[in-house]
Amino acid sequence: MLCEQILGKLEEMDVSGRRVEYVEIQWHEAFKKIHRKITDQGREVGIRMDDSVLSRGLFQGDVIYADEEVVIAVSTPPCEVIEISLTEGHEMMAAKVCYEIGNRHAPLFWGENDTYITIYDEPMMAMVSRIHGVRAEKKMAKLDFDKRISAAIHNHHH
């Protein structure tokens, strides 16, 4: 089966009477045009998107196939993240946090309750933890790409 476009969001579609299958797309795969995946029901799926996916991405709830019997949607699994918060009186350190994370080309998201979220790796955790007035905590979380701050999300390292 070949899926070549995003048909909409699962929560906005009427899927009654149809089986919903999910294909897992990791956060770092979301902006790739070509995938070969297996749904949670064992169906092999080829995904070949146009160039719009390079900036839009594939995310939780995106429907990539639908017929009268089955709907296939994207599932973005939780991943290790760093939740960053600023201690009282150190709100001005937000600019430094954003600069340092951006300088490493890492994705950055708004979190809950005045926090920021970025992808976990040990060098990033060490760097963020050294910034005065900043608390960093490692967690497992689903990324909400509607809350991304970064202009582009990609897996680029220096």
Located regions from the model:
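Short amphipathic alpha-helix segments
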Residues: L58, L86-I101
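Short, well-ordered loop/turn sites that connect or cap secondary structure elements
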Residues: S55-L58, I64
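Helix-rich terminal scaffold detector
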Residues: L2-V20, Q41, D114-H158
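Residues forming anionic-ligand binding surfaces in small-molecule and nucleic-acid pockets
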Residues: C98-G111
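Short glycine-/aliphatic-rich beta-strand segments at the starts of folded cytosolic domains
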Residues: V74-T87
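Generic recognition of long tandem-repeat/solenoid scaffolds
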Residues: R36, I84, T115-I119
